[in-house]
From Swiss-Prot:
Keywords of this entry: Chromatin regulator, Methyltransferase, Nucleus, S-adenosyl-L-methionine, Transferase
Name recorded for this polypeptide: SET domain-containing protein 4
Cellular component GO terms held in the UniProt record: nucleus
Binding site for S-adenosyl-L-methionine: Y244
Protein's GO biological process: entry into diapause; methylation
Lyase listed as a keyword: no
Highest taxon above the source species: Eukaryota
CDD domains noted in UniProt: SET_SETD4
Primary subcellular site in the record, as a coarse category: nucleus
Enzyme class, broadest EC rank: transferase
EC number(s) recorded for this UniProt protein: 2.1.1.-, 2.1.1.360
C-alpha cells in the first residue's frame, strides 16, 4: 500500500535529482519516491524492471568516502590517520553538514532523516526488560557508539573549532551505519583492507532492503560508478528493493533499528551458560574431558535455533554433553557421523533450554508490550514474537 509522502521529502529529493543530473547522473530505472505502509519511505519504478537491469549508477564524484576526506587539501593535515574508515566517514559527514549551503553535498544531506529511532536510545529500564541475548548485543553496540564518539569528537573540535554534541554525533553515526555501502573488488581505488572501503551514495540509500529479492552491487571501474543490478523482476509502479545480504533479525534490529517478518535468516542465539544450567538442573556431570573436547573442537560457536530448528552446533554439543568417557574417546564419530540419533538426555537438555528461553521471551514480551510511548517498542514486540515462534516450533518438534 502506498501512502502520501511528505511534500518536503519530495522537494528535497527533487533538488537532489537536479543536483545529481548536473554531475552526469541519470535516473536509469525511472525511480520515484513513495511512502509505503509496510516499509516507510522508499522508491517505486514507473516502468517494469527485468532481472539483469541496473537500478542505480552513481558517479564516483558523488560518493562520500573517508579516503576523499583524508586526502583532501583542506583537511588531510589534521585528520587522525588512526581513525577507522567508519569514524572518518562520520566525521566527514559532520564537517560537511556544518558547512550548510556551501557544502558540495548539501542537496544530499537535506534528504537524510533528521532523527532515527534506534534501540541504542532505549531507556535503561526498558533495556533491562530485554532478553539477555538481545541486551548483551545492544550493550556491545552502545560501547562501540561511545568509543566512536570519543574518536570523532577530537577531530571535529580541531576542524570546526567547537565541541561536538552527542546527539549530533549520533545522527551522523546512524546515517553512516544504516546507509554506507562497502566498496570492494574494484581496480584499486577502493580497498577493503584500507581506510577507504566505505561510501555514502546519494539516491541509493532511498532504496529499502528485503530478504526475498536478489541484487548485486559494487564499484565498476569501467564506468567509474557505484552500481546496483537487480536479479529480480519488479512490476510497474511497485516498490523496488535491494538486498543487503543474509542478516538475521537480531543484527538488523541492533544495527539498523528494524526487523523483517518471517525472515528466513532469523536466529535465536544460545549461550554456553544455557547448556551448563540445563546440565546442572538434570544432574548431568560435566567432566574435564568433556569441557576440553568442547573447547578443542570449538563447539560453542553458532549455538541457537533457526526457523527450522536447532543449529548443527546445538545438536553436536548436546550429543557431546550426553557422552560418557568411553564415547568421548571416539569423538570424531560422534561429531561427524552419529549426532542425528538423539538420546533421552539430549532431548531433556534441549527441552530445558527451550523452556527457559521461551519463559524469558514471554516475560519480556508481556512487559514491553505495555509501553505505548516508545516508537521502537512495536519493533521490539514484533522481534520477540518472531523469536518466540522459533522457540515454540523447535520445542514442538
Amino acid at each position: 500500500m502506498v501512502d502520501r509522502i511528505d511534500p518536503l521529502d519530495i522537494t528535497n529529493i527533487k533538488d537532489l535529482s537536479t543536483w545529481m543530473k548536473t554531475k552526469n547522473w541519470r535516473n536509469i530505472a525511472k525511480l520515484e519516491p513513495c511512502r509505503f505502509k509496510e516499509s516507510g519511505r522508499g522508491m517505486r519504478t514507473r516502468k517494469g524492471l527485468k532481472a539483469g537491469q541496473l537500478l542505480v549508477q552513481i558517479p564516483r564524484l558523488l560518493l562520500m568516502t573517508a579516503g576523499d576526506f583524508r586526502t583532501s587539501k583542506e583537511w588531510s593535515w589534521i585528520v587522525d590517520k588512526n581513525l577507522s574508515c567508519h569514524d572518518a566517514l562520520v566525521l566527514y559527514l559532520l564537517v560537511e553538514k556544518n558547512k550548510r549551503d556551501s557544502s558540495f553535498f548539501h542537496a544530499y544531506i537535506k534528504t537524510l532523516p533528521e532523527v532515527f529511532s534506534m534501540p541504542t536510545d532505549l531507556r535503561s529500564e526498558m533495556t533491562h526488560m530485554l532478553p539477555n541475548f538481545i541486551a548483551m548485543k545492544l550493550q556491545d553496540k552502545i560501547k562501540s557508539l561511545q568509543d566512536s564518539f570519543k574518536n570523532v569528537a577530537r577531530g571535529y573540535k580541531s576542524i570546526c573549532i567547537k565541541e561536538l554534541g552527542f546527539s549530533d554525533f549520533k545522527w551522523a553515526y546512524y546515517v553512516v551505519n544504516t546507509r554506507a555501502v562497502h566498496i570492494t573488488g574494484s581496480s584499486g581505488k577502493f580497498n577493503a583492507d584500507s581506510s577507504d572501503c566505505m561510501a555514502l551514495a546519494p539516491f541509493l540509500d532511498l532504496l529499502n532492503h528485503t530478504h526475498d529479492t536478489s541484487s548485486i552491487s559494487g564499484f565498476n571501474p569501467y564506468t567509474n560508478c557505484y552500481e546496483i543490478e537487480t536479479l529480480s523482476k519488479t512490476p510497474k509502479c511497485s516498490e523496488v528493493f535491494i538486498n543487503y545480504g543474509p542478516h538475521d533479525n537480531l543484527s538488523l534490529f541492533v544495527e539498523y533499528g528494524f526487523m523483517i517478518p518471517r525472515n528466513p535468516n532469523n536466529f535465536v542465539p544460545f549461550e554456553m551458560t544455557d547448556f551448563i544450567s540445563a546440565c546442572n538442573e538434570y544432574n548431568v556431570k560435566l567432566s574435564n574431558l568433556c569441557l576440553q573436547t568442547i573447547n578443542l573442537h570449538n563447539l560453542m560457536k553458532n549455538l541457537g535455533c533457526f526457523a527450522d530448528g536447532p543449529s548443527w552446533s546445538v545438536k553436536v554439543l548436546l550429543k557431546v554433553l550426553s557422552c560418557d568417557w568411553s564415547s568421548l574417546m571416539r569423538i570424531e564419530d560422534i561429531i561427524y557421523r552419529d549426532f542425528e540419533n538423539h538420546g533421552l538426555t539430549e532431548k531433556t537438555l534441549l527441552n530445558c533450554i527451550l523452556e527457559k528461553k521461551k519463559e524469558e521471551l514471554q516475560n519480556s514480551l508481556s512487559t514491553i508490550a505495555k509501553d505505548k510511548n516508545c516508537q521502537i517498542a512495536n519493533c521490539i514486540v514484533s522481534f520477540l514474537e518472531e523469536c518466540l515462534s522459533i522457540i515454540e516450533f523447535s520445542y514442538a518438534n
